[in-house]
Amino acid sequence: MKRFSKFLAVVALLGLFSGCAEKYTELYNLTPDEWYAQVIADIKDGDLEAADKHYVSMASEHVASPLLEQILLILAQAHANDEEYLMANHYLDEYIKRYGDNGPKTEFAQYLKIKANFDSFTQPNRNQKLMEDSVTEIEKFLYMYPNTEYRPLIETMLIKFKLALYFLDMQIADLYNRTGRDVSAKIYEQKLEESPFRNSDLIKPDVAWYRKLFE
């Protein structure tokens, strides 16, 4: 009886795997236009996992298809809209690697990467280094593309990142003072003294997401 039960379990498992395999073998040898339509349909259905898999199939079957360039940007934006910012940046990095021209295409993709990082800070528990890296990336972007059409948006992001870091430094200094770590507190107090925001009339946020770092 036990052997029969095990046999049924194995058969059921094989049937499950067969069903899964059959599901994905349905989509092979499609034209670039058909793959493109399938990825768009996946995105519309909210199934980004399927969209990712179908993109991989499309890219492997049609390496030189001009539709790949567009679909990479579409997937990046879809993941950003779904707050999957790491995946968004993955596709943007792939876009730059494949189609970067050190001109408008690269500039646009780099802008989207910065925007994805900026949008990710609407979530709590983001780390200080990621903010500092974002400031560095923005300053590098502005140096590389001084006449960029995205300058107003980029500069707004830069100011907000720097403000967030300033308030975060205030929180860290306060934390160190309250826990008796005077040397560390003085380091952050010195940073605050040297900040261009020091004498600014700033409205302190009531509930700052970066407080979650210490909770």
Identify the residue ranges that each predicted region occupies.
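Bacterial Sec signal peptide processing site at the extreme N-terminus
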Residues: 14-38, 50-52
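Sec-dependent bacterial lipoprotein signal peptides
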Residues: 1-20
